[in-house]
Amino acid sequence: MDQRLRRAVDAIARDRSSGAAELAFRACVALRQWARRQPTVSRDDLLAAAHAFLTAQPAMAPLLRLANELALAADESAPSRYLERSLSRFSYALRTSPAGIARHFLLALGKAKPKIIITYSYSSIVLRAIVAARSRIWQVICSEGRPALEGRKTMQQILRRGKGIGACLTTDAALHMFTAYSHALVVGADSLAETGFINKAGTGALVAHAAQIGRPIWVLADTSKLLPRAIDAIRSDRYGLDSEIWAAAPRRLSILNPYFETTRYQPGVSILTEKGWRTPAQMRREIKAIKVSPLLAALVKPPHRS
């Protein structure tokens, strides 16, 4: 594989704090630069790049969708032209979708007194929506987001960009306690599958508690996160290093450090994309319309080397 593209993929794979949309945009930039350096890309090059993106962040739908576009291009008679068109569409959606989601979010908050919002982890789309609606938000409460501390990043950005918003940080274990005082639990998603959405581990418990006490759960994600069943079947939820939990753990101690979990769609959960509010049934129809390359499943395995 092209070494500059390889370095870009490796940097994306190592990133533990950026949201899926941010990483996908970086991936699009790297792929478009690669395509310009190699105006005629071979089928093998496309499939090698597809494999690299499949394994870089295997729980994040936009990167899996980009891998799918690379695999689809490999079977085209004019792969370079197909790839340029698909990357242009993908990049445009990633650039413009956050503003559309932010507009819908602002309208949903209404014009009554400013609200308290609970959020979890870090999502660039959620952050942009909150900042755009700062005149209608009194306070945002978020937890640390251990072990990678993405919640701190969220709070730092709100303090820097969300003038007038009260920023409050708490522990992961205590975040649910403040849901009763909030207008809504607002989270992002790394993937939107047919039966549920994938986000940071711990999201499911927050959603269950919010639903139990009657608080709305809003999932903000653009349509690059839509994940067809055939791609979801090869997706994997990565576990982190033991050292992120305990740097010098005792021998014989097993450490479980899941990064992601799937939360099923349920009453109280509303999905907001750039197209507006979506029901699970609407999501399923849109997901089923996405073309999936038959080559994708085989690419999960490392390429054969002779």
Where are these regions (language model features)?
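Long amphipathic alpha-helical segments
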Residues: 1-87
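Gly/Ser/Thr-rich loops at beta-strand to alpha-helix junctions
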Residues: 20-21, 117-126, 147-148
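Ligand-binding beta-strand-loop-alpha-helix segment within the catalytic cores
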Residues: 71-115, 131, 135-185
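Short hydrophobic segments within beta-strands
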Residues: 118-120, 143, 220
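Conserved phosphate- and dinucleotide-binding cores of soluble alpha/beta proteins
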Residues: 137, 145-306
